[in-house]
Amino acid sequence: MNIDRIDKPTREQYEEYILKNQPFIITGVVNNWISFNKKWIPSQNIEDDYFLSILENKGIPVREIGIDVGEWLGKTKNINFSIFWKKWREHYFNFKNEKNNQSNNNNNNNNNNNNNNNNNNNNNNNNNNNNNNNNNNKPKYYLASLPIQTYFKELINDFEIPEIPKEQNKNGNLWIGFKDQITPLHHDWSSGDPGMDGLHAIIIGRKQFKLFDPIVNVNCFKRKKEWGKFHQSEFDLDNPDFNKFPEAKNFKIIEIQLNQGEMLFIPKLWWHHVKTLEPSISINFWFQHIGSELLKSNKLWCHMEQYLNAVFEMDATKISNDKFKKIIKYLTNDNNGGDGDGDGDGDQIIQKYKDDNLKLIQLPKFIDSFSNAVNNPIFKNHPKKDQFKFEITEKVNQWIEEKKKEINENKIVIL
């Protein structure tokens, strides 16, 4: 399946694809941003570097590559921006030089057909050396989805927030990554909403997106059963194990290359895997839309059921009491990490939740997360707001009652 490409889409065209829950590529927008027109492109002369001139001494949280600490995108570490940026610049210019050398070698080969064998040998040696140098100089850190409003206010005027996110006071999130970097299979979400619509804009570089329609691939990917990771797939697309996940054999993929100056609309609950093909700088925007929210209570409800089942089957004993206390505090607005019923001290209350995930799911704030969009001020007077909240809340409560019945009939054993 090919996805549509639309130049400077109107509001009506955005709405059409949001309601269809279909991705499309946007052109003619990003390439008009100040950031795209040379401002964010690294200068060969480091003294003229724009980012260093305004961000050099800023402390930022970065992700450390290759360290498995149970964090999906890598271990978080705070470092000075200049340390990160100088290393990324080095990687960027190494890549550009390698690309230019390959282009020159190809031109030389075309002009010197009589020396093909020698040229090919030299090219292979040069390419091997360039690849080794590029690998050796890959950054140790990368930026993953840092809110620009929070960490990089100096950059706010360098890009245009698309109309719908802007109406909702949503700002952009900055990504700065290296060649061959992978973001594993997932769909977009927030802590208060299990499914978000999104836009991904590339200012520098290219990325490969592997997209999976949630309707076509409804039973292909099992969710992780860990708090904060329910939007992530257990199936590793880069190292597929079809013996462990036989259902994944049936997936249907849409593969696209998103180029510099283009933006991709990623609809709600679409699974996607991302590979960075070149050193890249990107901005993404998440937003809500009542039209696509309504899909969660009908044709996308199966994914909400899978989400609920993942929470229900979570092994809460693997979560530390301190972390679990924060979860309960968030869901109950109780500073003591309790449930407000006065039944036992903090640790006893936490243990009650650990022993019964259904108790966690029944908390009003957790149930309300499925209709989180109705709290968005822009939807205050939307005619379908109350309908959506009623429908999705009813479905979640029905799921809870059915699960209780299964437990009472001993069809389910709570671990």
UniProtKB/Swiss-Prot annotation:
Residues covered by the JmjC domain: 127-302
Family annotation (InterPro entries): Cupin_8 (IPR041667), JmjC_dom (IPR003347)
Stretches the record annotates as Disordered: 97-140
MF terms (GO), sorted A to Z: 2-oxoglutarate-dependent dioxygenase activity
Biased composition (Low complexity): 104-137
Protein name: JmjC domain-containing protein C
Source species taxonomy: Eukaryota, Amoebozoa, Evosea, Eumycetozoa, Dictyostelia
